[in-house]
UniProtKB/Swiss-Prot annotation:
Species per Swiss-Prot/TrEMBL record: Formosa agariphila (strain DSM 15362 / KCTC 12365 / LMG 23005 / KMM 3901 / M-2Alg 35-1)
InterPro entries tied to this protein: 6-hairpin_glycosidase_sf
Alphabetical GO biological process terms: carbohydrate metabolic process
Catalysed reactions, semicolon-separated: Endolytic cleavage of (1->4)-beta-galactosaminic bonds between N-acetylgalactosamine and either D-glucuronic acid or L-iduronic acid to produce a mixture of Delta(4)-unsaturated oligosaccharides of different sizes that are ultimately degraded to Delta(4)-unsaturated tetra- and disaccharides; Elimination of sulfate, appears to act on linkages between N-acetyl-D-glucosamine and uronate. Product is an unsaturated sugar
Main location: periplasm
Compartment(s) where it occurs, according to its Swiss-Prot or TrEMBL record: Periplasm
Protein name: Broad-specificity ulvan lyase
Upper lineage: Bacteria, Pseudomonadati, Bacteroidota, Flavobacteriia, Flavobacteriales
Length: 638
């Protein structure tokens, strides 16, 4: 069988002509010599990851519970989805001719069949037949792509066995998946999954269901911003008190939108292409200049890694394959891949920008999932549009305020400053609180010269998915800037205020964002016996960001504003005086000044570290004093 390409030029050309855009390029011919720099980056990173996975693959035929699996440097268990690596391994085997990659692909499949394979055709997330089976769709896509593009390098016995196994998995997905049977990423991903499985197996029923689901998913985009929604429990269409849907940027850009784009291009689905183009443009507003994804507000940000989401696949296919519509999509694909490279060490992708500097071991899950989309890009390379970094990202050129009505989230930009303020009240779970940035909090603060300065974490780090997250090392200190007080060992903060609203004014010189917030505990009970209501304002000018916190109520308990500044331990910190701190970064010096003394929260070591989004930080705090009812904090960069 010769290597084939599902997504043909005709689809790319059609969508390029039907969606007017100043950035459309000619999609009617191949680009074998274009995008060479990005191709080299992609190829080299994929090889680095595959070789890294080879180093942790277990070869122990005497113990079938581990033989063939990928040992995780950070987790005590084996990840059931490690068989997803079959696709990148087989790709590497095909292009390199090296038998070691074929053997690696066979080994991960052997482990899966011995440990997570079920009679009904499913695979489970761990070696427990009662555990979650929805992940079958991801393994099935990996196996289908392996067989479609690279089956010619397999021996007949393996080819037959894997084809039969794919048929069983496909039948399970066909029988059990609907568009909204759980979080939208599963039904959405099954659209492409059933389609490609149907092609590999010649099963028309699978393709018909895929087409039906592709029509159904079009109802799951928000009214104003075309953000894909449905990442919430117990129903995908659950609304918050403000009437907002559950949206998660990480799952959307790294998983579901990939599936929708690849299906729509492959089948020339013009209706779906129109919608996903609008959706990609909206999601792209949240990419930061360095290629990081701003998921500070996302419903499932408990898996936010700055470059994406812990167990998703990567955003490269959706954005790269649509770069003929908007060249900035291509920029996004390149910049994010560069960030993935920066977060890679010893052949494995680490879960955030400061994992390596903090000495936090990586979870192998990041690598075997993010290797798949790189293989997919390379398998389609001759049919991709031109991909480069020449077109600026929206957040690079932004100047002013952008309000996402469907999230109640504000993006602000002035000079070199970029920031996100959130009053988003949607919740992932209907019983438990996995708090993302809200309550008028600053989810992101970024400066073009020095990079990321602030990034939200969970209010309290929680192992929402214990098999897909790493334990928090050391003391858990939230990274989200906030107002806080403690009373009778209860923590009260605006991070739990889901009723806050935002106001914004741009004078062309200064952007002013304001919110009235209340201090509440995790049970949403407001603090009593001390000030509970505060005015929180952010004023952004070219010269810097000024944060003011004030109240008209009596402050009877120690109350502070906390500003954690992202900073790896190698950066020099100077306490100029009790009101001023300087942090030296490669691109400049960050200065924090306040009208009251600045202190650091207590923690061990030289920095605190938070798993979300994988950052080291200096948790600066400043307390209200008896005669002062307004805190004034200024952040500047020179």
């Amino acid at each position: 069988m010769k290597r084939r390409n599902f997504i043909q030029l005709s689809s790319l050309a059609t969508i390029g002509m039907s969606l007017p855009s100043a950035g459309i390029v000619n999609a009617c011919s191949s680009f074998p010599e274009q995008s060479l720099e990005f191709k080299n980056l992609t190829s080299e990173l994929l090889k680095e990851w595959c070789d890294g996975m080879l180093k942790v693959q277990i070869n122990n035929p005497s113990n079938l519970e581990e033989h063939g699996a990928l040992r995780c440097p950070s987790c005590s268990h084996i990840h059931g989805r490690c068989m997803d690596a079959v696709y990148p391994f087989l790709y590497m085997a095909d292009v390199s001719g090296d038998e070691k990659y074929i053997e690696a692909a066979k080994l991960v499949m052997i482990w899966a069949e011995n440990n997570v394979s079920q009679e009904n055709g499913a695979w489970t997330v761990i070696p427990n037949p009662k555990s979650w089976k929805g992940i079958t769709i991801f393994g099935a896509i990996a196996l289908a792509e392996s067989l479609h593009y690279h089956s010619h390098i397999l021996d007949d016995k393996t080819l037959k066995a894997w084809t039969n196994r794919l048929a069983r998995a496909g039948q399970y997905i066909y029988d059990t998946f609907t568009i909204d049977f759980t979080n939208i990423n599963y039904g959405g991903t099954a659209i492409y999954g059933l389609d490609i499985i149907g092609d590999v197996l010649g099963n028309g029923n699978f393709k018909e269901k895929s087409k039906k689901m592709a029509e159904e998913v079009q109802a799951f985009f928000t009214k104003n911003d075309y953000l894909l929604y449905g990442e919430c429990k117990p129903e995908a269409d659950k609304l918050s008190a403000k009437g907002l849907h559950g949206v998660d940027l990480g799952y959307n850009v790294e998983e579901t939108l990939n599936s929708l784009v690849m299906y729509a291009l492959k089948n020339d689905d013009q209706a779906l292409l129109q919608i996903v183009t609008k959706s990609l443009n909206s999601h792209l507003e949240f990419m930061l200049p360095d290629g990081g994804w701003d998921n500070s507000w996302g419903n499932r940000m408990y898996k936010w890694t700055y470059w994406g989401s812990r167990t998703c696949d990567g955003s490269q296919p959706a954005f790269a394959m649509m770069a003929h519509i908007n060249p900035a999509f291509g920029t996004a694909a390149v910049k994010n891949t560069e960030l993935l490279k920066q977060c890679t060490a010893n052949g494995l992708l680490h879960g955030g920008p400061h994992y390596i500097s903090a000495g936090i071991p990586p979870c192998v899950h990041h690598t075997f999932t993010h290797a798949k989309p790189l293989a997919a890009l390379l398998d389609h390379w001759k049919h991709l549009p031109e991909i480069n970094k020449t077109t600026a990202l929206p957040r690079v050129t932004a100047n002013g305020i952008k309000h996402f009505k469907d999230l109640d989230v504000l993006l602000f930009s002035r000079g070199d400053w970029r920031g996100t303020v959130s009053a988003y009240d949607a919740e992932y779970h209907y019983k438990k609180d996995y708090r993302q940035a809200t309550g008028g909090s600053l989810g992101i603060l970024y400066h073009n010269k020095v990079g990321l300065l602030c990034a939200a974490s969970m209010a309290v780090y929680n192992m929402v998915e214990p098999y897909n997250q790493q334990p928090q090392p050391g003391k858990d200190i939230a990274l989200t800037p906030r107002i806080e007080t403690f009373k009778e060992d209860q923590w009260y903060t605006n991070l739990y205020d889901l009723t806050a609203n935002l106001e914004a004014i741009d004078t062309k010189e200064v952007i002013n964002l304001a919110s009235v917030v209340k201090l509440k505990n995790e049970s949403r009970k407001m603090v009593s016996g001390t000030a509970s209501e505060f005015h929180l304002t952010y004023s952004c000018a070219k010269e810097g960001l000024t944060i003011k916190v004030s109240t008209q109520q009596d402050i009877l308990e120690p109350t502070a504003f906390v500003l954690p500044i992202a900073s790896p331990e190698k950066e020099k910190v100077e306490f100029v005086n009790e009101h001023e701190i300087k942090i030296s970064k490669p691109g400049g010096v960050v200065t924090i000044k306040a009208n009251v003394p600045l202190k650091l929260k207590e923690y061990s070591g030289t920095r605190t570290f938070n798993m979300v989004p994988g950052l080291e930080a200096l948790p600066i705090e400043l307390f209200f004093e008896t005669h002062i009812k307004e805190l004034v904090l200024i952040v500047s960069v020179v």
